[in-house]
Amino acid sequence: ISIADKVTDDLLRVNVEGTENLLSAALGSRVKKFVYVSSVHAIPEQPLRVLSETDDFSPDKVQGAYAKTKAMATEKVLEYVKKGLNAVVVHPSGILGPYDGSGNHLVQLVTDYVENKLPACVKGGYDFVDVRDVAAGTLAAAEKGRTGECYILSNRHYEIREVLAIVRSVAGGRRLPVLPVWMAKLALPLMEFIAKCKKKRPLYTKYSLYTLTSNDKFSHDKASRELGYRPRDLYETIRDTIAWLRRKTPLPA
């Protein structure tokens, strides 16, 4: 997962070449079912429309390095279906939740807020979903998903200020000023410079700001209908995430 703007060799190697290696091995070994975890970012954005599943994937139709490589990889999966592989695709939205020690950007957002490291938040939001619901949906796709079909595993749109309000109701904290996206863009070079000096990834990028204002009206009706997918309210997700973080690290009470 990356919020970088440019496609790197590492992204191509992991997201595209790595996926094709797995597909080739699965086809050669005649595996019973192959489930590919794509992303809603791989789905071409159509402004003002509810976005549902598609079989049209192209890096030229999506924005950002991560989205482009996931679109390329998803296209590969559907090519292997035509070769005889029993494969299905799931498209999670913005994943958040406990038990993720991989450096998840949204978990880091929650952590930084609780530790009083966020000076402000940005106007905008996205569709955020619990990692446990994504896991359950992926397992259901393995059991019930139809060959060659795609399933969106989303929840609903939450404004960033709404997410932080939930965090505040669980863990306390102060209200943050909400910056317009244009102001966050002006500060972007400074944020990237500070992150580079500290040898840390930037808090946000041009691409992550784009996602906060993009169309995130994803429909999970198909997954609910065919897989029994039922995403939970984000309050439960954030409550459990903070409880997990407090067991893992000494967060402020």
Positions of predicted regions on the chain:
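Mid/C-terminal beta-alpha module of Rossmann-like enzyme folds, strongest
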Residues: G137-L203, H220, R225, Y235-A253
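Conserved Rossmann-fold NAD(P)-dependent oxidoreductase catalytic core, especially the SDR/UDP-sugar
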Residues: T8, E17-Y66
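Substrate-positioning beta->alpha
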Residues: N21, M72, H105, V122-A142, ...
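Conserved catalytic-site region of short-chain dehydrogenase/reductase
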Residues: I3-A4, S39-V50, I95-Y99, N104
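NAD(P)H-binding glycine-rich loop region in Rossmannoid oxidoreductase-like domains
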Residues: I1-E17
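Active-site Tyr-X1-5-Lys
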Residues: L27, V62-H91
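NAD(P)-dependent short-chain dehydrogenase/reductase
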Residues: K83-V89, S93-D127
